[in-house]
A protein has these predicted regions:
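N-terminal membrane-anchoring alpha-helices
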Residues: 1-25
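Short cysteine clusters
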Residues: 110
């Protein structure tokens, strides 16, 4: 069945993989340290991960995680399409789980490290109490990784989860 899934997804995955390789050729930093022990970035090979990372969070739906990462790191995934979020319940559960992690550094990524991973990082920062508002989180993140952004559905899920933080 896995082979059949790959064959069916081929028309989507090949162009996406090529676009991803083009993006890599633009020489932007793969990741940025946002707060101590918490990195945000794009999809990387195991050799590109920052030192100190033990937990890798993958929020891509279009790529399978690299085997070297899946086999050598704690690896959690929440498959999410670009410019979207997962279900509110699964998103909240994962952000709470990440916020409680204290064993090692955490690397959160999507394909380019701009939207889906940023949405999850905002939630983690809110869960940890490191920021009080979505805008404060975005300012903190943009201070390190300027290319981040939230699409409307991503911001909406954050607002619905953290409405008690909104002024």
């Amino acid at each position: 069945m896995r082979l059949l899934n790959r064959v069916c997804m081929l028309p989507f995955c090949v162009p996406y993989e090529l676009a991803w390789k083009f993006y890599l050729s633009r020489q932007q930093p793969a990741w940025h340290l946002i707060v101590p022990g918490l990195w945000l970035g794009r999809r990387v090979q195991a050799s590109e991960l920052p030192k100190g990372v033990g937990l890798v969070i993958d929020v891509t739906a279009e790529f399978e995680g690299f085997r070297a990462i899946r086999d050598n790191y704690t690896y959690w995934t929440l498959p999410t399409l670009d410019a979207r979020t997962a279900t509110k319940q699964s998103f909240k559960a994962l952000s709470e789980r990440i916020a409680k992690w204290s064993e090692s550094g955490i690397y959160i990524h999507c394909a380019k490290g701009r939207g889906r991973s940023t949405t999850l990082l905002v939630a983690v920062l809110m869960e940890r109490g490191q920021v009080q508002t979505i805008d404060e989180a975005m300012e903190l993140i943009r201070g390190q990784r300027p290319q981040v952004r939230l699409h409307k559905p991503q911001r909406e899920v954050l607002e619905s989860l953290y409405e008690h933080h909104l002024a």
